[in-house]
Curated annotation (Swiss-Prot):
InterPro entries: KsgA/Erm, rRNA_Ade_diMease-like_C, rRNA_Ade_Mease_Trfase_CS, rRNA_Ade_methylase_Trfase_N, rRNA_adenine_dimethylase, SAM-dependent_MTases_sf. This is Ribosomal RNA small subunit methyltransferase A. PROSITE patterns: RRNA_A_DIMETH (PS01131), SAM_RNA_A_N6_MT (PS51689). Belongs to the class I-like SAM-binding methyltransferase superfamily. rRNA adenine N(6)-methyltransferase family. RsmA subfamily.
Length: 287
């Protein structure tokens, strides 16, 4: 028996496909999303419809973004939801959610996008970074993720889970864990535990920065060398005198600073950019 085959479809490794089938977990996720008939919901990676069907039954219309050609075609011909579904066959990492918001005239309707999905674990972090760009047109997001990723999203300073992903997520959103999900809830079963997280974009950013590049830069540099003191880890960006003037303990490490501290450092760099920094380079990170 092919353990990767579910409802006639074989999971494709390159798309990171693991299909949810546990009814109680599905009910818990739908309850957390709490979809209402007139809301504009967007599902990323609907797969075989484990969440699409129960959510679709509760709303007037549902937009789904699916990269897998075969699955997209199945959804277009869904036996009882096809008239409610708009299937966008594309890579969510490349999709312009802002253009969708504009096309659907949601501003005139006083609405924003509600985004949810069982995200492919191999792209979940970069996909969330992509979605954060559209924080001002998104009402909330509910995602199934690797449990360790949810821990990082929800982490507090002075913990091992606290990192660049924590800071960037909490910069844009209020983050709350919803429920934990065992591997047995999927087919094929992943090798890791999963969890559902709720992200609600801030109506007003609590710690706005002048240029997101510098927030990304200082977080990447600090957490890539998280065992070093900030005096050493950030030495190419700040002098010890600069850090002290900004209220940073020279002996602190990356996980000791709050988001407000990183925002303060980023804003100083925006006003005092090092001459030898190329802003077009790709930032590496431990996340």
């Amino acid at each position: 028996m092919n353990s990767k085959k579910h409802l006639g479809h074989t999971a494709r490794k390159r798309f990171g496909q693991n299909f949810l089938h546990d009814t109680s977990v599905i009910q818990g996720i739908v309850a957390a999303i709490y979809p209402q008939p007139n809301q504009f919901l967007v599902e990323i990676g609907p797969g075989l419809g484990a969440l699409t069907e129960p959510v679709g039954e509760l709303v007037d219309h549902l937009t789904v973004v699916e990269l897998d050609r075969d699955l997209a075609e199945r959804l277009r011909h869904h036996p009882f939801l096809h008239q409610k579904l708009t299937v966008i066959e594309t890579d969510a990492m490349q999709f312009d959610f802002g253009a969708l918001y504009t096309k659907e005239n949601l501003a005139e309707k006083g609405q924003k996008l509600r985004v949810f999905g069982n995200l492919p674990y191999n792209i979940s972090t970069p996909l969330m970074f992509h979605l954060f760009k559209y924080h001002d047109v998104i009402q909330d997001m509910h995602f199934m993720l690797q449990k360790e990723v949810v821990k990082r999203l929800c982490a507090a300073p002075n913990s091992k889970a606290y990192g660049r992903l924590t800071i960037m997520a909490q910069y844009f959103c209020q983050v709350m864990p919803v429920l934990e999900v065992p591997p047995s809830a999927f087919k094929p079963a992943p090798k890791v535990d999963s969890a559902v997280v709720r992200l609600i974009p801030h109506k007003e950013l609590p710690h706005p920065v002048k240029d997101l590049y510098w927030l990304n830069r200082v977080c990447s540099q600090a957490f890539n060398q998280r065992r070093k003191t900030l005096r050493n880890a950030l030495s190419t960006l700040f002098s010890p005198e600069n850090l002290t003037a900004l209220g940073i303990d020279l002996n602190a490490r990356a996980e000791n600073l709050a988001i407000a501290d990183y925002a303060r450092l980023a804003n100083w760099l925006a006003d005092n950019p090092p001459a030898d920094i190329n802003k077009d380079e790709i930032l590496d990170s431990e996340e």
